[in-house]
Structure formats: structure tokens, C-alpha cells
């Protein structure tokens, strides 16, 4: 009898999966987000495959960082944004209780208000805004910027999250100041000694947005730089998950906002390098030589055991993407340290309108923690210490 019941339940599950595939497009259905074998939390978060070419990375989950991979091997991590937050008076109230509660997925201003309240600790009173500044700064027209932002907010509201690159945007040939306009779409993979992937630097914010958008050309999903609110949501996501594991709230908040030395590539950090290559910074000048992680240089910034040593001043090392497993949280590599990352957030400063976030590897982890907001002189060209990260949504 138990066996018969088990077979019945198996049949029901298979039928449910078949129906889901037909409805959600995993076997040629429509363009709605696909869910298939991805875990979810009812009423809170519903991860989806951007399209049928993605698959789940084995062994990953919502508790430790759910990862998917596209057909080219690029990997993305799900950022949870609980759908229940919009009904919480702590987040939906401005003057009277619930006056900022969204009425639908297109109630964009109220959705954004709630997300700002939810991430208030990481906004930290910033005057930066997710508003259009110029075509030259963002790589988008005003209409395109507004449309993109609304689509992001709508998707987050409906699905309870979004995807970001597991790794910093990467490229197979290291860029230098003398390189011309970048044209190659970014990767989101871990580099190795044999196949190094370098942080995609010497790009402007507008170029980074244009490059990122190439990943979804002709696709049914969108690819973009993150807006400022998305970066803050990534930090909040890490906070919530770490607290759920028993980490004290104060401890994780400090690691995200005050001092990220313990989990990022900074000059005052020490950690084991597991793969890839590195280049030495000396007095904020980056070497043109990239050394395998298991070898040393005359500077001895990395010892014979592949352990990065503590540096001072403006010395340090720049890593290829995903080089150290100690420089990650929730399966997201190098959110703290290595290179700063462009966002579509505006500083409203005519000389430096584009906000970038995170740390820099020849500086300390308390000066440039993961939370850090700063700016780049976008109009003057790219820098060796500023890159970007891809966001996917549907």
C-alpha cells in the first residue's frame, strides 16, 4: 500500500513538473520566468531560470547562495528580496501606516520606497539616487534608463529577487590604459592559471552598461549593471542569511559596512589564494606581469604557500576573478575588495556622476568596505581599479 501511494505521489509530481514546464517555457512554452528544479520559499522568493539554456549548479541552495549557469559557463547568484516586506509597516509607512504600500507591481515609486526602507542601514543617508544623469554617463537615454529601472523594480516585486554575477565581470585578455574601446561581452567565471579571467577594467560606466546589455541581446531576459538599490539589496541579503546561520547581527553588519578586511582582497588582508593569477600593486601602480597563484614575486606579497601577506601604504595585489574562496559570501566572490564596481546610481556630481561600490585591493578593508559608495571620473576614461558586475532579471 505504501509503495502504491509512493508511486501515485511520484506520478503527481511528474505531472506537476510537466505542467510547469509547459507553462513556464522550459520545453518550449512562453517567455515567463522558468522555475523547474529551483528551490523557492512560498510567498517570499521564487528563483527562475532566465531562459531554458540555464541550469542549476549542483550543491547550491538558498541558504548558502543559489547559483545557476548559462550554456557558456557564466554563473549567477540569486539575491533574495522577500515579497512580504511590502506589507510590513516598518517599510511601507511614511506619514500614516501603510501609505507607501505598493498596490501592484507597477507602483514603482512605492516599491522603491519600501526597498529603500528595507536597506536603510546600507543607504546610510546617501544623497545618491537611481535617477538618469546623462547618456554619456550611463550609456542610456533618459527613457531607456527609466524603463530599465521600472522593469527591475517590477521583476523584484513579482519574483522576490534577482540574479547577479557570481564573479566580477571578466575578460580573457587583460586590459591596459592603452587599449581602445571595449567590445567583448563580459564573463562571469572563475579564472585559472591555464585560462585566466581578468577583472574587466579600463572601461567607463557607459561602456560597462553597453557591454553588459550584450549578454541579453536577442534574449527574453535583461542584463544590466546594478542600480544602487540592488547593491544595497545584495548587502541586506547577505546580512539576513548570515544572521539565519547564527552570526550576530552586529558582526555581519560591521563586516559589510565598517570593515570588510576579513572577506575581501585588501592590502591589509591575508588569505589563501586557490586558483588563477595575481599582479602586484606597488605605490598604487599595477604591474603588467601576472603571476600564477602558487608562485612568488620579488615583492613577496604572496608566500610559497599561496597565502597573500599583509601590505601597507598603497601596495597590494589584484586577483583574477574568483581566485580566493575566502573572498566571498553567499557564493558571491569579490564583492568586497579587488576592484570597485560601477552601478547606475547617480551622484549628481557633474565631474563624477557615476557611483561605484565596494573596495579596492591596494587600500584597506575599513576604508573601502563592501558597502562603500564612491565615484569615478567617468568622462576621463576608465581606471585599473574599477570594474563592474552583471545583473540579470526578467
Predicted region positions:
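Disulfide-stabilized, aromatic/cysteine-rich ligand-recognition loop
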Residues: 202-210, 222, 226, 321-327, ...
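GGW-centered surface loops in extracellular recognition modules
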Residues: 29-89
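Active-site-proximal beta-strands of protease catalytic cores
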Residues: 336-344
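A signal for long, low-complexity, Ser/Thr/Asn-enriched, surface-exposed stalk/shaft
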Residues: 1-31
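Short aromatic-cysteine micro-motif
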Residues: 72-73, 104-334
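Acidic glycine-/aspartate-rich tracts in secreted/extracellular proteins
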Residues: 82-86, 168-171, 344-350, 361, ...
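Short, solvent-exposed loop/turn elements at domain surfaces
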Residues: 85-95, 171-177, 364-368
Amino acid at each position: 500500500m505504501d509503495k502504491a501511494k509512493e508511486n501515485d505521489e511520484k506520478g503527481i509530481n511528474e505531472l506537476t513538473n510537466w505542467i510547469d514546464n509547459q507553462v513556464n517555457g522550459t520545453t518550449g512554452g512562453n517567455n515567463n520566468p522558468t522555475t523547474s528544479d529551483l528551490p523557492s520559499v512560498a510567498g517570499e522568493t521564487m528563483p527562475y531560470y532566465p531562459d531554458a539554456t540555464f541550469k542549476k549548479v549542483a550543491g547550491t541552495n538558498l541558504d548558502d547562495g543559489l547559483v545557476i549557469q548559462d550554456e557558456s559557463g557564466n554563473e549567477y547568484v540569486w539575491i533574495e528580496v522577500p515579497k512580504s516586506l511590502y506589507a510590513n509597516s516598518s517599510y511601507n509607512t511614511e506619514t500614516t501606516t501603510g501609505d507607501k504600500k505598493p498596490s501592484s507591481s507597477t507602483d514603482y515609486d512605492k516599491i522603491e520606497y519600501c526597498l529603500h526602507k528595507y536597506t536603510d542601514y546600507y543607504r546610510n543617508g546617501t544623497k545618491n539616487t537611481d535617477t538618469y544623469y546623462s547618456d554619456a554617463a550611463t550609456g542610456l537615454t533618459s527613457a531607456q534608463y527609466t524603463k530599465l529601472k521600472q522593469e527591475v523594480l517590477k521583476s523584484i516585486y513579482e519574483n522576490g529577487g534577482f540574479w547577479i554575477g557570481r564573479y566580477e565581470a571578466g575578460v580573457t585578455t587583460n586590459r591596459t590604459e592603452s587599449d581602445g574601446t571595449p567590445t567583448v561581452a563580459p564573463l562571469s567565471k572563475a579564472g585559472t592559471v591555464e585560462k585566466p579571467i581578468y577583472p574587466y577594467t579600463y572601461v567607463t560606466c557607459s561602456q560597462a552598461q553597453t557591454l553588459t546589455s550584450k549578454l541579453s541581446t536577442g534574449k527574453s531576459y535583461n542584463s544590466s549593471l546594478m542600480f544602487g538599490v540592488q547593491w544595497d539589496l545584495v548587502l541586506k541579503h547577505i546580512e539576513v542569511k548570515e544572521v539565519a546561520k547564527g552570526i550576530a547581527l552586529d558582526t555581519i553588519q560591521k563586516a559589510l559596512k565598517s570593515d570588510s578586511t576579513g572577506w575581501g582582497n585588501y592590502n591589509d588582508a591575508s588569505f589563501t589564494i586557490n586558483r588563477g593569477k595575481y599582479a602586484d600593486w606597488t605605490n598604487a601602480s599595477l604591474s603588467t606581469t601576472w603571476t600564477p597563484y602558487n608562485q612568488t614575486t620579488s615583492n613577496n606579497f604572496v608566500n610559497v604557500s599561496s597565502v597573500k601577506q599583509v601590505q601597507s601604504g598603497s601596495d597590494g595585489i589584484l586577483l583574477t576573478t574568483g581566485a580566493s574562496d575566502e573572498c566571498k559570501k553567499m557564493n558571491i566572490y569579490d564583492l568586497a575588495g579587488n576592484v570597485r564596481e560601477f552601478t547606475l546610481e547617480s551622484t549628481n556630481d557633474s565631474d563624477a556622476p557615476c557611483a561605484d561600490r565596494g573596495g579596492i585591493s591596494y587600500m584597506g578593508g575599513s576604508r573601502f568596505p563592501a558597502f562603500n559608495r564612491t565615484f569615478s571620473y567617468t568622462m576621463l576614461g576608465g581606471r585599473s581599479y574599477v570594474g563592474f558586475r552583471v545583473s540579470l532579471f526578467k
